[in-house]
Amino acid sequence: MSIIEHLEQLLEYGLERKLISIWDREYTRNRLYEALGIIHPEPVSSTSIKQSQSLPDLLAPIYKWAAETGRMEADTDTYRDLLSAKLMGCFVPAPSEVIRKFEETKALYGPKQATKEFYQYSEDVYYIRTDRIAKNVHWTVPTEYGELEMTINLSKPEKDPKAIAAAREQEQTNYPMCLLCKENVGFEGSVNHPARQNHRIIPVILEDEQWLFLQFSPYVYYPEHCIVLKGEHEPMEISKKTFERLLSFLGQYPHYFIGSNADLPIVGGSILSHDHFQGGAHDFPMARAEAEDVYELNDYPGVSLGLVKWPMSVLRLQGDEPGHVAEAADHIFRTWQTYSDEKASIAAYTGDTPHNTVTPIARRRGDLYELDIVLRNNRTNEEHPLGIFHPHQEVHHIKKENIGLIEVMGLAILPGRLQKEMKETAAALCSADPKTALEQNPLTAKHSEWANRMMEKRTITKENADLVIKEELGHVFARILEHAGVFKQTAEGKQAFRRFIDQLARKPVKSLNR
């Protein structure tokens, strides 16, 4: 097939997915020609073109042609992503039209249908890259904290050497200032910054402030994984306003959860420079975890406080008035900010440097507003230079990155290297001399101590090796979350947690479960 025929197939795809109407066909065709620098197209009958392929399959021969004819620097992931956004941007209307359609659907059919359709639209225009996401490995593992969710992240492509070299030569720019800024809408992109011609955002008002209900994450980790960001490029900051905004969002989108990463290094997310939340239509393991005790907060009638059975230190607020819940959350946050407990290795400050903050997550529970406050501390010491309440050295062979919002809630995002390393570990465990095989293979040597302990407590065969390793990875993740918990899952740790709760109520609290 010629390039013109491939583009006609792409047009048919756009018509089938209702990205364009028949009256947009010629206009969109000319935009595609312009995007590819086609000046004298050969005539082709659109009526003879039929297509039943997936979008990635439709784009593949276009990439090949573009690389062969010099329209694309190289046929690699980096340059394919730049070209695909440019081509699919030809099918995307102006932002105001996307917003109008969203608001119309929301008014007629409700917010759940509006977000569902916007999610499908984001897939159809290849903003959400479903083919890449499908590469991720998912499984669940039962633990004492409930069933934890596990993911080996294989969806994000690595930059190829050619793109890395080109990035070094390219002039650095501060536009857009970060990957979240609203200026990304329609942005052409470069080897240093992803293209966003097929990207649209939906505005949302939170507590009388203009925020933006961003598109769904291009590499979603769970259903309808969305980002809600501040209109201006301002750093992450947890305050009473944070809790009010989260609860305000739930008033408009009650079918979603919404949460914020912490605002300090080590315990925060990967982007601290732009205030934002993450949400979606997923019931995380932490949301399913029950409160072991429920208390009355003396100064906040109508708001209950529960200690969640979870490896991290989580306080769960519930109430039917969002304003009261936000007040109680702010009380917890302000108390925690200045709280120190030497017995529990908790210090609020080193000099003037603050260490205590929170990761808040909100959801609706019927008519109730539920707000989980996860206590965080980013202090380091000689024994734990990356963080006292951070994955410890013993688990770094699996994961040493920060524990952000998604993992706090019980979904592990493990590095892609583990896919091959765990396959090699399974083979070594089933070999004639497992210990030697583990130590001599550079892919498994770092896992040898862990794998040897696995052999001591589990019977491992060729048939069950993969399953055993996945189960043990789940238990490592539970331990990682325990490391990140400020009050430990010991008698001393639980006693320390209750000392903090006594501070909240100004006098010993009353447990409603006793």
Residue ranges and their predicted role:
Residues R200-I201, G231-I258:
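Helical scaffold of the NTase/Pol beta-like nucleotidyltransferase catalytic core
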Residues M1-V228, E232-P235, K309-P311, A326-A329, ...:
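Active-site microenvironments that recognize anionic phosphate/pyrophosphate groups
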Residues K241, L250-S273, G279-S340:
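Catalytic or ion-translocation cores adjacent to nucleophile or general acid/base/metal-coordination motifs
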